[in-house]
Amino acid sequence: MVLINQLGAVLAVCATLTVAAPTKGKARFNVPQVAIPKKMVHHPAVSYARALHKFGMKVPKTVQDAAKGSVPTTPTPSDEQYVTQVTVGEGKLNLDLDTGSGDLQGHNLYKPTSNSKRLNGYSWQISYGDMSSAGGDVFLDTVSIGDVTASSQAVESAKKVSDQFAKDKATDGLMGLSFSVLNTVQPKPQTTFLDTVLSQLEKPLFTCTLKHGEPGSYDFGYIDDAKHSGEITYTQVDNSEGWWGFTADSYSIGGPNTTSFRGDSSGMANGGSISGIADTGTTLMLLSDDVVGEYYGQVQGATNDQQQGGYIFPCDAQLPDFTLSIGGYNAVVPGKFMNYQEIDGSMCFGGLQSSGSSGGPNIFGDVFLKSQFVVWDTQGPRIGFAPQA
């Protein structure tokens, strides 16, 4: 870890909103994402390690070792992170909107102003599976996104940061859109951005339209019917632990009518249901060993490579589609989305990896979410899916 004064800056992130600014009527607004440089400076196993650690799963030594490596060739462009501009105090930060976090955390310049207020005795600390970490003090400041402003936001100002965070120039941090129970500010957790601004929104929901290979967008307070085709299928959310958790009735590899379809003809669970967490802050999709092994068993040349820290395959391999059946709706992830990143000129790292042998949670990250139009509705709560228009 490097003390922040040695870096010549105060790194920060916004964690939680406690007071929403008054508004006339109800707000609805669109927030476009910002394109970030596509050239990656770390091994793809870093994304894998961070995802495992984020959800309390053991990070195998092989993954840790691979995450410390580098990619010697210019990699194929990948959708590692999606960022959105958020005004924090007097500055603008490019943040990853993260439904798997209750904080707003980051690693870019933050300067408390005369309007900022330190929360004495409050602190924060985060770490990830690739050994990156940051921590520091908490201030109250103004945070705005779109047409909504929180006038008293808990801003996590970093006093120390590891080299991994200091070298990450692609994004400035993350804004949590989970339920407030996940907030990590101590000694008293704060409300999330989403929970704070709900009263300002026309409807207590937001949607995301993540894209493959290009920026997408978030809409707050309304559903833009021009962004999806067909009806939206909803399913109940389990938020008992703060996550946007849901259960898919069944899955299939190669299509819902293939022999690997798990479930009966009605689409109801028959030993093939998959419960997991929808998380825009996780790049990959993580499923159980048997499902992942079954998928790559249909990919010629695929192998679980210990040196690379996960499943890899020839970059020109034909990858089958992966389908989740949710309330009678088939959410299809095109096979090409499963090709996450080139690692050595001929082999590629998979966008689907194992959630571990210890029974860790399944994670429906961006590899899955960018194939769908998704509604995150706090009433219920529930989550909805439809094909993107």
From Swiss-Prot:
UniProt propeptide residues: 21-67
Q: Which residues form the Peptidase A1 domain?
A: 82-386
UniProt keyword annotation of GTP-binding present: no
InterPro entries documented for this protein: Aspartic_peptidase_A1, Aspartic_peptidase_AS, Aspergillopepsin-like_cat_dom, PEPTIDASE_A1, Peptidase_aspartic_dom_sf
Q: Which family does it belong to?
A: Belongs to the peptidase A1 family.
Q: Where in the cell is it found?
A: Secreted
**Active-site residues, record numbering mapped to chain:** D98, D279
Q: What is this protein called?
A: Aspartic protease pepA
One biological process term in Gene Ontology: proteolysis
Subunit-level organization: Monomer.
The entry's cellular-component GO terms read:
extracellular region
- Give disulfide pairs as residue numbers: C315-C348
**GO molecular-function terms, A-Z:** aspartic-type endopeptidase activity
Q: May I ask which residue range the UniProt record assigns to the signal sequence?
A: 1-20
Q: Does the keyword Protease apply?
A: yes
Glycan-modified residues:
N257
The top EC class, named as a word, is: hydrolase
Alphabetized UniProt keyword annotations: Aspartyl protease, Disulfide bond, Glycoprotein, Hydrolase, Protease, Secreted, Signal, Virulence, Zymogen
